[in-house]
A protein has these predicted regions:
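Sec-dependent signal peptide recognition
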Residues: 2-9
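Bacterial Sec-dependent N-terminal signal peptides
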Residues: 3, 15-37, 142-153
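N-terminal export/targeting and maturation segments
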Residues: 20-67
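N-terminal glycine/threonine-rich, aromatic-flanked beta-hairpin/loop signature
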Residues: 47-102
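Beta-sheet ligand-binding and adhesion/scaffold domains
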Residues: 89-153
């Protein structure tokens, strides 16, 4: 009986040792952005079919809207001031925009590797319209009033 137990233990041990650890795909690590100055971002208003190029300078930026993805017909242009706070271990990078008409947006920069556009990893900024205290503004139906999504490679 002891011999049978030893034999079973030997077979079980041999089987465990022969199991291979599955290969893990290497994780993609992308650098955090320390700044968004002098960068070009893209956005699309799918409801109104407007394609945007958003250019960030040192402290101001410009958002240009086009009627198609080929950027042939410019239909809008507006300027904004912005602040950018780089990410820390505890907090995502923060982005705040204030347009010339006083409309404000606030949100976060999501690191590359979490979203893809055309099968490419992209940095992603998610902004919501906010009041002067930084609180998200909701419409009469309790839905977020306005948001902007933008990305860059």
């Amino acid at each position: 009986m002891k011999l049978l137990k030893y034999l079973i233990c030997f077979v079980a041990s041999t089987m465990l040792l022969s199991c291979e650890k599955p290969e893990e795909s290497p994780s993609k690590t992308y650098p955090a952005l320390e700044s968004i100055s002098n960068t070009l971002w893209y956005s699309v208003d799918t409801k109104n079919q407007i394609y945007y190029d958003i250019t960030y300078g040192e402290t101001t930026g410009e958002m240009v809207g086009y009627s198609n993805s080929l950027r042939e017909d410019e239909i809008s242009r507006c300027n904004f001031a912005y602040t950018f706070t780089p990410a820390t271990d505890e907090v995502d990078a923060l982005v705040n925009l204030t347009f010339e008409d006083g409309v404000r947006y606030g949100g976060i920069l999501i690191p590359k590797g979490n979203f893809q556009v055309n099968n490419e990893d992209v940095y992603w900024i998610q902004l919501y319209e906010v009041d002067d205290k930084g609180n998200i503004i909701y419409d009469d139906n309790g839905k977020i009033k306005s948001s902007i999504l933008m990305w860059r490679e």
